[in-house]
């Protein structure tokens, strides 16, 4: 999608806003509501699957519609490249951008249900002592799909945009619906009784339960800065292609071959998380990620010509190893710290706090690259600053992760930690 928007003439700021901030804005409003209602829902098929069944088909539908945005724009504009709508002069690429944005709103709205409740379902049905290894196996399957995509589809993704989105939407619906009709949820205790009905009392309950202890606030802030690492991720592909001069085929092949390394290290990384506790391994991963991106800043000062590809292979292999640790530690870390009965609501609060920072953060990332373009002059040298953004953003994340580890140890650590329940508020 970033390449498609770039081809349509979108600025870096608009690219970041459409791809990142729009989804974050919808997440801010939807995730707490979904989490609160799902945790308290008791249906014949459980508390997660009923929501997944109705939302999944709409996710696939909007994926297909996004793929056909060009066709809809051509249908509305005919053969004209410039035309009038409601008194406004609009070009065909701008109309395509508008349609993509509209369909993306629908996609983000419906996928907020699936993306949220899928992880809650995993927490409900998978034993916690093997959670990291389960997530590793889940990621391995995902990476196999990504590797095949990068090898055989990515190099021509702009040429077959419609077909890719149509097939992806259909596969998405089929895969998730199979899961919904085969996975069985267990029994849950009844929802909390004695709560006042109504929207305002629900908000008060939600706020009191989610933000009542220091350790939860530290989890939220650690998660915020980890998420902000992805605020500029759209520009990684632009760094590799536009700035470093690599072809789409080069990047696709690199992602395929380095993905093999990812597959090899995911399960050992998950074993480390289960063995030493995911909070510890997550902190190690953040520190290593910071150091790696400092080294990648070398491209700000020097271009290595044909050696760029070899150097990028080295950095990507190292990054995949570190990301394996982070990916197999993040979700299990939340599952070990948040109360299990209210896990969805705590994740909803986490998503809400993350979004408050991510919306301005992603727009700021795009704006920074637009401003850098003015200072770096002609060409696309500004994208070489992508790892600098990552290095700067990750420092507060390391600080909060250290503070989280200290609070976790104070509350019992690996041997005796119990998620705090109703306690007096405690700030950072």
Predicted regions and their residues:
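Short amphipathic helix-loop junctions that connect adjacent transmembrane helices
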Residues: 1-14, 234-251
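Glycine-rich segments within core transmembrane alpha-helices of 12-TM secondary carriers
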Residues: 23-28, 132-154, 351-362
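Helix-to-loop junctions at the C-terminal end of transmembrane segments
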Residues: 29-45, 265-278, 369
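A membrane-interface helix-boundary motif in multi-pass transporters
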Residues: 47-50, 86, 154-170, 369-394
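C-terminal ends and interior cores of transmembrane alpha-helices
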Residues: 53-92, 288-305
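Multi-pass alpha-helical transporter architecture, strongest
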Residues: 65-73, 174-183, 299, 386-426
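Juxtamembrane intracellular "pre-TM" segments in multi-pass secondary transporters
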Residues: 187-219, 419-428
């Amino acid at each position: 999608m970033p390449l498609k928007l770039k081809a349509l003439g979108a600025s870096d700021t608009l690219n970041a806003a459409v791809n990142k901030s729009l989804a974050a804005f919808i997440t801010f409003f939807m995730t707490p509501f979904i989490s609160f209602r799902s945790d308290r829902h008791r249906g014949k098929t459980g508390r997660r699957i009923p929501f997944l069944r109705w939302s999944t088909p709409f996710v696939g539908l909007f994926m297909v519609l996004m793929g056909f945005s060009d066709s809809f724009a051509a249908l509305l504009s005919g053969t004209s490249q410039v035309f009038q709508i409601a008194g406004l002069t609009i070009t065909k690429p701008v109309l395509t951008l508008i349609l993509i944005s509209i369909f993306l709103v629908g996609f983000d709205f419906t996928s907020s249900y699936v993306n949220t409740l899928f992880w809650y379902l995993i927490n409900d049905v998978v034993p916690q002592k093997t959670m990291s290894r389960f997530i590793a196996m889940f990621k391995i399957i995902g990476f196999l799909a990504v590797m095949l995509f990068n090898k055989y589809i990515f190099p021509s993704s702009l040429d077959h945009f419609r077909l890719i989105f149509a097939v992806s939407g259909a596969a998405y619906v089929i895969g998730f619906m199979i899961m919904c009709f085969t996975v069985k949820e267990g029994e849950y205790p009844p929802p909390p009784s004695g709560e006042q009905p109504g929207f305002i009392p629900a908000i008060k309950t939600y706020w009191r339960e989610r933000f009542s202890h220091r350790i939860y606030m530290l989890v939220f802030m650690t998660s915020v800065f980890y998420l902000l690492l992805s605020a500029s991720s759209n520009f990684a592909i632009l760094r590799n292609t536009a700035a470093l001069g690599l072809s789409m085929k080069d990047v696709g092949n690199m992602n395929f071959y380095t993905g093999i390394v990812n597959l090899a290290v995911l399960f050992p990384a998950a074993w480390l998380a289960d063995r030493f506790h995911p909070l510890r391994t997550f902190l190690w991963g953040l520190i290593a990620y910071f150091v790696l991106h400092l080294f990648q800043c070398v491209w700000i000062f020097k271009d290595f010509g044909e050696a760029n590809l070899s150097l990028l292979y080295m950095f990507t292999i190292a990054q995949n190893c570190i990301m394996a640790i982070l990916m197999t530690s993040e979700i299990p870390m939340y599952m070990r710290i948040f109360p299990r009965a209210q896990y969805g609501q705590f994740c909803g609060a986490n998503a809400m706090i993350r979004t408050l920072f991510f919306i301005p953060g992603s727009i700021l990332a795009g704006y920074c690259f637009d401003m850098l373009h003015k200072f770096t002059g002609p060409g696309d040298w500004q994208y070489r600053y992508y790892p600098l953004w990552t290095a700067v953003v990750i420092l507060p994340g390391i600080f909060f992760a250290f503070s989280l580890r200290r609070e976790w140890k104070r509350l019992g650590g690996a041997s005796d930690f119990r998620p705090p329940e109703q306690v007096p508020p405690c700030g950072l």
